[in-house]
From Swiss-Prot:
It is found in: Cytoplasm. Mg(2+) binds at D8, D10, D128. Keywords: Amino-acid biosynthesis, Cytoplasm, Histidine biosynthesis, Hydrolase, Lyase, Magnesium, Metal-binding, Multifunctional enzyme. Its EC number is 3.1.3.15, 4.2.1.19. Pfam families: IGPD (PF00475), PNK3P (PF08645). GO terms for biological process: L-histidine biosynthetic process. The active site is at D8, D10. InterPro entries: HAD-like_sf (IPR036412), HAD-SF_hydro_IIIA (IPR006549), HAD_sf (IPR023214), His_synth_bifunc_HisB (IPR020566), HisB_N (IPR005954), Histidinol-phos (IPR006543), IGPD_sf (IPR038494), ImidazoleglycerolP_deHydtase (IPR000807). Gene3D superfamilies: HAD superfamily/HAD-like, Imidazole glycerol phosphate dehydratase, domain 1. The lineage of its organism: Bacteria, Pseudomonadati, Pseudomonadota, Gammaproteobacteria, Lysobacterales. Pathway: Amino-acid biosynthesis; L-histidine biosynthesis; L-histidine from 5-phospho-alpha-D-ribose 1-diphosphate: step 6/9; Amino-acid biosynthesis; L-histidine biosynthesis; L-histidine from 5-phospho-alpha-D-ribose 1-diphosphate: step 8/9. Residues 1-168 are annotated as: Histidinol-phosphatase. This is Histidine biosynthesis bifunctional protein HisB. PANTHER family: IMIDAZOLEGLYCEROL-PHOSPHATE DEHYDRATASE, IMIDAZOLEGLYCEROL-PHOSPHATE DEHYDRATASE HIS7.
Length: 357
């Protein structure tokens, strides 16, 4: 899905003159830092749509010919710098007309509201007036009021680009079934002590390894039917954690994608993974004991398979050694250490020739 940044024109892309009409070439001046900000957002996957009110455009007081020349030059300059606009939507009514197509109305948005390829959760609106923020509210998207001497506001273009392109990768997943109630919170861009409670102390310790050695904040709270057995709790925790990883990663733009071999005394574990969007799990290893602590060893590969299914992860996990405790822990640590480079931001490009992950 593609996020859209809807952008006001006068006062947002180009400076607004005292008479509020850019009807001559000499009035054309760009707002500071707009071009580098739009380039950053373009590289983060955004498309741009201009939405502008032009009072009485086409009337004797504001002839269309006076508007078209400067507007075309503006678009040409943006295009010369690598910035193109998906659409330019213009309302030509007067304020007193109360036209539904005039911002903050969303009458010009009909086609976009029907477009299921738009990522509305990441989309936004940038403008210099309160009506632009109201327009954003009407679309249920995030609004940014650009700071200007005329209308106030608190944002500049670098700040807007940072807020959208470098947005924190967080997720909260609540998974409730008849057998379990599980809540997972994570922040891929913040290191913090993991907080884990599943009712299975050894499983808690293993999950802590994922947050600690993966380098991200992780909180898992699980209640399950442990009076029956551990299966549902371990399986559903894997599914909830996988779903949270998928949600936090978004379109995966900028991630390392791939990623570890980890020794632990006599044990060696190897985790090779790919956030390909095609879940697949291969496990090579054997456990001699039926349980390690309160965790059945047969559920160790089952947890990882559940994680892969929910996150869209391709994981090949191998482990060999003599001590089953070491082998189980090495599996979790190897996954975590493989996650660290795979989740790390390494720019803005999508690591795929297909254009999607």
């Amino acid at each position: 899905m593609t996020p859209i940044l809807f952008i006001d024109r006068d006062g947002t892309l180009i400076e607004e003159p005292s008479d509020f009409q850019i009807d001559a070439y000499e009035k054309l001046r760009f707002v500071p830092q707009v071009i580098p900000a739009l380039l950053k957002l373009r590289d983060a996957g955004y498309q741009f749509v201009i939405v502008t009110n032009q009072d009485g455009l086409g009337s004797d007081s504001y002839p269309r010919a006076s508007f078209d020349g400067p507007n075309e030059l503006m678009l040409q300059i943006f295009e010369s710098q690598g910035i193109t606009f998906r659409d330019v939507l213009i309302d030509c009514s007067w304020p007193q007309d109360n036209a539904p197509t005039r911002k903050p109305g969303i009458g010009l948005m009909t086609a976009y509201l029907q477009d299921r390829s738009i990522d509305w959760a990441r989309s936004g609106m940038v403008g210099d007036r309160i009506t632009d923020l109201q327009f954003a509210d009407n679309l249920n998207i995030r609004g940014f009021q650009l700071r200007t001497a005329q209308f106030g506001g608190q944002w500049d273009w670098p700040g807007i680009a940072h807020a959208l392109a470098d947005a924190p990768r967080t997720a909260v997943v609540q998974r409730d079934t008849k057998e379990t109630k599980i809540r997972v919170e994570l922040d891929l861009d913040r290191a913090a002590d993991a907080h884990i409670s599943t009712g299975l102390p050894f499983f808690d310790h293993m999950l802590e390894q994922i947050g600690k050695h993966g380098g991200f904040a992780l909180d898992i709270q699980a209640e399950g039917d442990l009076h029956i057995d551990e299966h549902h709790t371990i399986e559903d925790t894997g599914l909830a954690l996988g779903q949270a990883l998928r949600e936090a990663l978004g379109d995966k733009r900028g991630i390392g994608r791939y990623g570890f071999t980890l020794p632990m005394d006599e044990t060696l574990a190897s985790a090779a993974l790919d956030f390909s969007g095609r879940p697949y799990f291969v496990f090579e290893g054997e456990f001699k004991r039926e349980r390690v602590g309160d965790m059945p060893t047969e559920l160790v590969p089952h947890f990882f398979r559940s994680l892969c299914d929910a996150s869209g992860l391709n994981l090949n996990l191998q482990v060999r050694g003599d001590n089953d405790h070491h082998k189980v822990e090495a599996c979790f640590k190897a996954l975590a250490r493989a996650l660290r480079p795979a989740l790390a931001r390494q720019g803005t490009a999508l690591p795929s020739t297909k254009g999607a992950l």
